[in-house]
């Protein structure tokens, strides 16, 4: 029986991006194929769990008496190293909508309800692979470096070729039609742990978005209000 390396499962509110404020059960998978210097997540420790055990834990975390189920967010680490369509299908069968947070270097299950890709401008150890599901949002963690240069490096991954050129996909704010898919674009200030530097990065984000209105600001609201 297939097992997964799970770092943690917890019930909270989604703190970032388009789904900010939604009740969500996070399933954090261990392991990542990148080592980003600004990463604020511990994902190396794990417990081996089957899909059935994960689902049972998810169900146990929220009240069965409420009329609506929370969103399930698959995150990491890098969840595409372990998660497949069959696992997403099991969550669907239990009535959950399923979102994933990925770095975009590997194909994501095509049956996800929502895919957030947060590309990193770091050398990849793997070849180019198409994304199984196109991203619904692209979230860039902004460290203060030149964003235009970073975006050009993301295009070189080869994962976003279906959007057309860099100039084309960066100019769209939302999904314009069923025929052409354009992800929402979010710029998120990096939390460096230094309040002075953080304030400068936030201002850079605000200034950039005012000059490029197709972008939106994403804040780590869970940190702002002191929840997990």
Would you name each region that the model predicts?
Residues 69, 80-228:
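Conserved AdoMet/S-adenosylmethionine-binding subsite of the radical SAM
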Residues 17, 21, 77, 132-135:
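Glycine-centered flexibility motif
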Residues 13-16, 36, 46, 61, ...:
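A broad, structure-centric signal for solvent-exposed, well-ordered loop/edge residues
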Residues 12-14, 18, 28, 73-74, ...:
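Generic detector of intrinsically disordered, low-complexity, polar/charged segments
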Residues 1-26, 30, 34-38, 211, ...:
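Flexible, acidic/Gly-rich N-terminal and inter-domain linker regions that tether
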Residues 4-8, 23-24, 30-112:
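Conserved Radical SAM active-site core
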């Amino acid at each position: 029986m297939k097992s997964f390396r799970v770092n943690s499962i917890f019930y909270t509110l989604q703190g970032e991006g388009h789904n900010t404020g939604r009740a969500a059960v996070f399933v954090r998978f261990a392991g990542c194929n990148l080592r980003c210097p600004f990463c604020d997540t511990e994902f190396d420790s794990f417990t081996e769990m089957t899909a059935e055990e994960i689902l049972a834990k998810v169900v146990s975390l929220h009240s069965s008496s409420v009329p609506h189920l929370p969103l399930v967010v698959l995150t990491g680490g890098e969840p595409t190293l372990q998660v497949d369509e069959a696992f997403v299908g099991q969550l669907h069968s239990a009535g959950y909508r399923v979102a994933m947070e990925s770095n975009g270097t590997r194909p994501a299950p095509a049956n996800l309800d929502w895919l957030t890709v947060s590309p990193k401008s770091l050398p990849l150890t793997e070849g180019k692979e198409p994304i199984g599901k196109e991203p619904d949002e692209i979230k860039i963690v902004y460290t203060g470096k030149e964003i235009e240069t970073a975006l050009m490096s993301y295009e070189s991954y080869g994962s976003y070729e279906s959007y057309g050129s860099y100039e084309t996909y960066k100019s769209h704010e939302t999904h314009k039609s069923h025929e052409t898919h354009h992800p929402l674009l979010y710029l998120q200030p990096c939390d460096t742990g230094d309040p002075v530097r953080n304030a400068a990065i936030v201002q850079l984000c605000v200034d950039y978005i005012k000059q490029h209105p197709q972008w939106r600001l994403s804040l780590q609201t869970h940190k702002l209000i002191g929840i997990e």
